[in-house]
Amino acid sequence: MMKTNYENIAMLLQNGTSVKIYADNFSVSNIRLLAQTAVKHGAVLHLVVNPDYILADNLKLISQDGRKNIFVEFV
């Protein structure tokens, strides 16, 4: 199994591929950049989030980047 990293996800999004990631593996700033990349290239970024890990305010900022392109799932 390939280790998930920011560069791999960004490359997939730049190619218009929709991806589902576990937000715990990324910094908030990287998630924000991935969200912006998804919007720019018409891909969908599905974030699986542990509510104890990331603040709701950060999720609001991230989701403002593109409501149709960003999905947040709490686990």
Q: Model-predicted segments: where are they?
A:
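General marker for long, soluble alpha-helical cores
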Residues: M1-V75
